[in-house]
UniProtKB/Swiss-Prot annotation:
Catalysed conversion reaction: Hydrolysis of (1->4)-beta-D-glucosidic linkages in cellulose and cellotetraose, releasing cellobiose from the non-reducing ends of the chains
Gene Ontology CC annotations of this record: extracellular region
UniProt lineage: Eukaryota, Fungi, Dikarya, Ascomycota, Pezizomycotina
GO biological process assignments: cellulose catabolic process; glucan catabolic process
Name listed for the protein in its UniProt record: Probable 1,4-beta-D-glucan cellobiohydrolase A
Record-linked PANTHER family: 1,4-BETA-D-GLUCAN CELLOBIOHYDROLASE A-RELATED, 1,4-BETA-D-GLUCAN CELLOBIOHYDROLASE B
Chain positions covered by the region annotation Disordered: 399-420
CDD domains documented for this protein: GH7_CBH_EG
Gene behind this protein: cbhA
Annotated source species: Emericella nidulans (strain FGSC A4 / ATCC 38163 / CBS 112.46 / NRRL 194 / M139)
GO molecular function terms listed in the Swiss-Prot or TrEMBL record: cellulose 1,4-beta-cellobiosidase activity
Induction / repression: Repressed by D-glucose.
């Protein structure tokens, strides 16, 4: 996963922070998108994307030695968190050759496996040093997507989180990496697999993964609100708000982070489950998939509207457009749960019907999600799941639950079909293509 270059990296003077190397020039692939007005007119914006720093070659600032190889840190360069930040730098990326990331005009394709690299995550940039920030309230976000080459167990995701616009550059003295090198990631799982958090290496307490040759779990995590516009493959899709107690990125420690990476899933300051709308899970098994109403064998358009009432987020609506037809989101077919959009009433009823703990409400629900929605970064990714094989998206989950019970079945994939060993060997050529991104007031983009 991590690029090995053979060029010199300059020594950078910092006290603590993630540093930028100079072995390879960082050139962001261009990606145009459109900003629309209430009148319906749209203006093209010349943007670009940047690769997340977690995927990058991490090496000594004054040489070629890997700070991180496979899923382990170099004990000499990284004996502790602060020393690691002083001694190590992340470097530029060869987007296509190493990571399988290509762009063409308004289109971005992410390949699943390229050489030894698995998956990728990129952010939309305003300029070379700053992430593009979005204010979602009373606006809509629209894009085209082709998921026809995404089988069971894969996730071609498009979502927003409350990352810092500069990747944390201004918060940590001497940080020479920042958004230009894709730093500062956070989400509602409070992920602990991030190598550098808040200008420090995540070395102390690091445990290499037993199943993922490129990853591990450290002593720190990084939390922030997350709005999943699109988590999908060709079989299933879901959109999900995940609020947190803080609207900004925060650091956590150990199991108090909660989320996927901790023993106490609900022990943190964020909602790792969210309030999801998955049409299959909501009882409409013929709405989305190959040959379905939304036919995933060909490209289609996804529209998501963030409706505010008195300045507070009150509803998240979904429409699709395919073959020139506007298609509203499917209606819930679950007894006791009404509607085809995410509202506070829908979320409460859904948690009750499925017997799920209402962590969403405990962390402020839609109102808290709306509080965070004024400044969010756009993220596009392709990934597989070493924790639950993506069964929460496209199969029956939990694995020991009766699939006939409400909320258990989320798609038609067999349990185990998404095992990373299976998908990485049998579907290495998988990919997702996002294109034609538009953003503007409700009703302006389609």
């Amino acid at each position: 996963m991590y690029q090995r270059a053979l060029l010199f990296s300059a020594l950078l003077s910092v006290s603590r922070a993630q540093q930028a190397g100079t072995a390879q020039e960082e050139v962001h692939p261009s990606l145009t998108w459109q900003r629309c007005e209430a009148s319906g007119s749209c203006t093209e914006v010349a943007g670009s994307v940047v690769l997340d720093s977690n995927w990058r070659w991490t090496h000594s600032v004054d040489g070629y030695t890997n700070c991180y190889t496979g899923n382990e840190w170099d004990a000499t360069l990284c004996p502790d968190n602060e020393s690691c930040a002083q001694n190590c730098a992340v470097d530029g990326a060869d987007y296509e050759a190493t990571y399988g990331i290509t762009s063409n005009g308004d289109s971005l394709t992410l390949k699943f496996v390229t050489g030894s690299n698995v998956g990728s995550r990129v952010y939309l940039m305003e300029d070379d040093e700053t992430y593009q920030m979005f204010d979602l309230l009373n606006n809509e976000f629209t894009f085209d997507v082709d998921v026809s080459n995404l089988p069971c167990g894969l996730n071609g995701a498009l979502y927003f989180t409350s990352m810092d616009a500069d990747g944390g550059l201004s918060k940590y003295e001497g940080n020479t990496a920042g958004a230009k090198y894709g730093t500062g990631y956070c989400d509602s799982q409070c992920p602990r697999d991030i190598k550098f958090i808040n200008g420090l290496g995540n070395v102390e307490g690091w445990e290499p993964s037993d199943s993922d040759a490129n990853a591990g779990v450290g002593g720190m995590g990084t939390c922030c609100p997350e709005m999943d516009i699109w988590e999908a493959n060709s079989i299933s899709t879901a959109y999900t708000p995940h609020p947190c107690d803080s609207v900004e990125q925060t650091m956590c420690e150990g199991d108090s982070c909660g989320g996927t990476y901790s023993d106490d899933r609900y022990g943190g300051t964020c909602d790792p489950d969210g309030c999801d709308f998955n049409s299959y899970r909501m009882g409409n098994t013929s709405f989305y998939g190959p040959g379905a109403i939304i036919d995933t064998s060909s490209k289609f358009t996804v529209v998501t509207q963030f409706i505010a009432d008195g300045g507070s987020l009150s509803e998240i609506k979904r429409f699709y457009v395919q073959n020139g037809e506007v298609i509203p989101n499917s209606e819930s077919n679950i007894s006791g749960v009404e509607g085809n959009s995410i509202t506070s009433e829908f979320c409460t009823a859904q948690k009750t019907a499925f017997g799920d703990e209402d962590i969403f409400a405990q962390h402020g629900g839609l109102s808290a999600m709306g509080d965070a929605a004024s400044a969010m970064v756009l993220i596009l990714s392709i990934w597989d799941d070493h924790h639950s094989s993506m069964m929460w998206l496209d199969s029956s989950y939990p694995t020991d639950a009766d699939p006939s019970q409400p909320g258990v079945a989320r798609g038609t994939c067999e349990q185990g079909a998404g095992d990373p060993d299976v998908v990485e060997s049998e579907h290495a050529d998988a990919s997702v293509t996002f294109s034609n991104i538009k953003f503007g007031p409700i009703g302006s983009t389609f």
